[in-house]
């Protein structure tokens, strides 16, 4: 089908190009923009109305004028050349190699705007993914096919946590093909260098595909990048039978780009200036995670977002929480105490944890042990608040044990090194070690036979 070319550019507003008298432009259709000096840019149709096509430009609008600019409509939506050879490679936000390697010889070209997985086609997630981080594996377990976001704040170590998870994550069955698709949106050059160096130096890059969009890159790339990353994941998972962990950071930058484009289109804003359709837009990303009936592959998602002002009620974390299956919250208070990774286990939640733990998956005592650790840590934190008012001298001997437990739980269980990879057996064993400082008669949430089998209390 021949490309249709138009020279009827009527207006340029921010990253948008308005082309008049285009009768058959289609939503998401790709376009080629040729400047008067022969330079070319790419774009995508965002909207069509009464012959007017609104085109989002990939790149700067510098040099583009209403006179002498030719817009060619390709008659197809954005497609990604895709192959297993993408593993071990680094790409920009529109899928072009930026690591100095050769172009990808595509075995397929897949549309990047794939639909969410049909609920009827979904298989219930049930297999444990080990991250090597106790606060996640032991208390907020990640399950294959789940979408579990990380809520962080400015200056908190979410980048280090993302790199650590990408390096350490694995399924317990070593025969399974496991890989990571990593997508970063709106990051600084320093952060991009950090991620690429970490992936290369630790060997994680060999089983990873990286997509990087810098803060200086066009905002439209931030809209496209997660879709390109997920298209790559879908190919590897559902056509090659691999188990893919998709890490997307920072979804707040993605939503800021969505707001910028919405403002350029002069749409009526919703909460805090974000477009009213942001919930629907986010769902088209998050709902592409999961498992398909009759297919060996799976896609697990860990979107990372920074909460402006540490406000968990901000529209981005708020809407993300509605769509996803829990959240991992990084605490600024724990970070101030140098308790990396600083995960607040009481605010965190994995809604699919019960499907991925227990006998035959992790260990039979996992659920009861996690509940007991939650209860003991919550009691210890309550006693901290009380101690600030009445002093530690007013506490009973038993209360002091719980107060001490909260401190040791943070310093030994939550805190761990950046290169410390704890197995699930190590994590569960550490939990029993910490509980041994409390009276055994207080262990109401673990079964007596589990106490007998795994408990670390000294026998009198």
Swiss-Prot record:
Organism whose genome encodes this protein: Thermoplasma acidophilum (strain ATCC 25905 / DSM 1728 / JCM 9062 / NBRC 15155 / AMRC-C165)
Protein family: Belongs to the ATPase alpha/beta chains family.
Signal peptide: none
Subcellular location: Cell membrane
Subunit structure: Has multiple subunits with at least A(3), B(3), C, D, E, F, H, I and proteolipid K(x).
A Pfam family that the UniProt record links to this protein: ATP-synt_ab_N
CC annotations in GO: plasma membrane
Molecular functions per Gene Ontology: ATP binding; proton-transporting ATP synthase activity, rotational mechanism
Keywords per UniProt: ATP synthesis, Cell membrane, Hydrogen ion transport, Ion transport, Membrane, Transport
InterPro entries with a match to the protein in the record: ATP-synt_VA_C, ATPase_F1/V1/A1_a/bsu_N, ATPase_F1/V1/A1_a/bsu_nucl-bd, P-loop_NTPase, V-ATPase_su_B/beta
Summary of the function given for this chain in its UniProt record: Component of the A-type ATP synthase that produces ATP from ADP in the presence of a proton gradient across the membrane. The B chain is a regulatory subunit.
Topology within the bilayer: Peripheral membrane protein
UniProt-recorded name of the protein: A-type ATP synthase subunit B
GO biological process, one term: proton motive force-driven plasma membrane ATP synthesis
């Amino acid at each position: 089908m021949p490309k249709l070319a138009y020279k009827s550019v009527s207006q340029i507003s921010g990253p948008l190009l308005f082309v008049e008298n285009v009768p058959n432009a289609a939503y998401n259709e790709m376009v080629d923009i040729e400047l008067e000096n022969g330079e070319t840019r790419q774009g995508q149709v965002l909207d069509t109305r009464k012959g007017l096509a609104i085109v989002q430009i990939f790149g700067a609008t510098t040099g583009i004028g209403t006179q002498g600019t030719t817009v060619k409509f390709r008659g197809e939506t954005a497609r990604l050349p895709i192959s297993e050879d993408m593993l071990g490679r680094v790409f920009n936000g529109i899928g072009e190699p930026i690591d100095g390697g050769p172009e990808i010889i595509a075995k397929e070209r897949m549309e990047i705007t794939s639909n969410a997985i049909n609920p009827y086609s979904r298989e219930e997630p049930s297999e444990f993914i080990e991250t090597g981080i106790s606060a996640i594996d032991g208390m907020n377990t990640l399950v294959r096919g789940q979408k579990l976001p990380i809520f962080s704040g400015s200056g908190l170590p979410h980048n280090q946590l993302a790199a650590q998870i990408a390096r350490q994550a694995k399924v317990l069955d070593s025969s399974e093909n496991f890989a990571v698709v990593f997508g970063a949106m709106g990051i600084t050059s320093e952060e991009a260098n950090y991620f690429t160096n970490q992936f290369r130096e630790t060997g994680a890059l060999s089983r990873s595909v990286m997509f990087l969009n810098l803060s200086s890159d066009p905002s439209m790339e931030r809209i496209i990048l997660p879709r390109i990353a997920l298209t790559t994941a879908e190919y590897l998972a559902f056509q090659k039978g691999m188990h893919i962990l998709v890490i997307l950071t920072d979804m707040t930058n993605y939503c800021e780009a969505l707001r910028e484009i919405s403002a350029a289109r002069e749409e009526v804003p919703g909460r805090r200036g974000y477009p009213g359709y942001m919930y629907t837009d986010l769902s088209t990303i998050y709902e592409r995670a999961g498992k398909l009936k009759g297919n060996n592959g799976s896609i697990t998602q860990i979107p990372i977002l920074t909460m402006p002002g540490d406000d968990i009620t901000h529209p981005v974390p708020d809407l993300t929480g509605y769509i996803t299956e829990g959240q991992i919250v990084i605490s600024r208070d724990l970070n101030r105490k140098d308790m990396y990774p600083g995960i607040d286990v009481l605010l965190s939640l994995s809604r699919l944890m019960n499907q991925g733990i227990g006998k035959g998956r992790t260990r039979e005592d996992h659920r009861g042990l996690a509940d007991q650790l939650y209860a003991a840590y919550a009691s210890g934190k309550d006693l901290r608040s009380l101690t600030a008012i009445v002093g530690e001298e007013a506490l009973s001997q038993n209360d002091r044990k719980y107060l001490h437990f909260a401190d040791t739980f943070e310093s030994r269980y939550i805190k761990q090194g950046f290169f410390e990879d704890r197995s699930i057996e190590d994590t569960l064993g550490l939990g029993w070690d910490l509980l041994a400082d409390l009276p055994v008669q207080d262990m109401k949430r673990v079964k007596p036979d589990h106490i007998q089998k795994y408990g670390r209390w000294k026998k009198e």
